[in-house]
Amino acid sequence: MENMHLRRVRTMPRHSQSLTMAPYSSVSLVEQLEDRILCHEKTTAALVEHAFRIKDDIVNSLQKMQNKGGGDRLARLFLEEHIRNITAIVKQLNRDIEVLQEQIRARDNISYGTNSALKTLEMRQLSGLGDLRGRVARCDASIARLSAEHKTTYEGLQHLNKEQQAAKLILETKIKDAEGQISQLLNRVDLSISEQSTKLKMSHRDSNHQLQLLDTKFKGTVEELSNQILSARSWLQQEQERIEKELLQKIDQLSLIVKENSGASERDMEKKLSQMSARLDKIEEGQKKTFDGQRTRQEEEKMHGRITKLELQMNQNIKEMKAEVNAGFTAVYESIGSLRQVLEAKMKLDRDQLQKQIQLMQKPETPM
């Protein structure tokens, strides 16, 4: 019965398993009652056997006493004891019967509760079975629908497979055509590469020839520039020496004139100084013009040197040479400027000395 109950509990849904705890307790009580009944039956059987043994002993003793004689008193005592034992056994049996009746009533009540619980469980199981049957029916319907969909999808897959095979054939033909076109293009590319390689070789030869020409031209320009720089330096040195000589001569002449003609005025000296400064300005303008001419010539050569990409290195060298030339000209200008400052300072000192001498020469004339 317990195994059947467990099977029912396993087949029940989850929401009804909480109600199966009461039948478990009732089953345990029934088992306890059955165990107690078995114990009482064993005790009663033992008591009955003990009573029958006493009875047999009494009968045997009475028979012995009758055979011997004078055993009425002992027989009576044995009978009284036997009656007491029987009455005690009967009382014990009555009490046990009452207890068993109460336990049977409780068992009947428990069995009634278990039966009602089992009926409710059976009803719930029937309802669960109905739900399961409905679910099974729905599952059968969904399976039928899925089988129909599977059939349609299988047919669609077959159709797609056929289309794929047709498309594969078309693609293979197109791939073959493309491979033929690619081979033609590769042949054309090879031809163009060979033509370009020949052109590059020719252009390389031309560029080497042009580089040689540019190298010779650059060497010529460098030599010309170096010659011009040397000539300019020599000319500047000559001019500087000539100007220094002229200035010294004029200073000497002025000192002689001052010594000879003490009555000369300062206006003549200023005119002469202004003429000398104008002459110096003319000399500087001439030098600037020569420098500007050389600069324009270098720029023209630089513009002609930027014709091709291969002339970049040559242009860099030209720039370096130009920087050197500019540095040389700037040094020349600085030397000319410093010389001019020295000459102006010297002229100023000479003029101050002349003015002092004139003042000294004019002072003795005033008291006379």
Curated annotation (Swiss-Prot):
Q: Does the keyword Ion transport apply?
A: no
Q: Which organism is it from?
A: Homo sapiens
> Where is this protein found?
Postsynaptic density; Cytoplasm
Naming one, the record's GO cellular component terms include: glutamatergic synapse
Q: Which domain of life is it from?
A: Eukaryota
| Intrachain S-S bonds | none
Where is coiled-coil annotated?
A: 78-110, 161-192, 236-290
Assembly and interactions?
Interacts with DLG4/PSD-95, GRIN2B/GLUN2B and SYNGAP1; the interactions facilitate condensate formation.
Could you tell me the keywords of this UniProt record?
Coiled coil, Cytoplasm, Synapse
Protein name (record): Protein FAM81A
Family (UniProt)? Belongs to the FAM81 family.
Q: What role does it play?
A: Facilitates the interaction and assembly of proteins within the postsynaptic density by promoting the condensation of postsynaptic proteins via liquid-liquid phase separation. Required for neuronal activity. Accumulation at the postsynaptic density results in enlargement of dendritic spines.
Principal location class:
other
* Annotated GO MF terms: molecular condensate scaffold activity
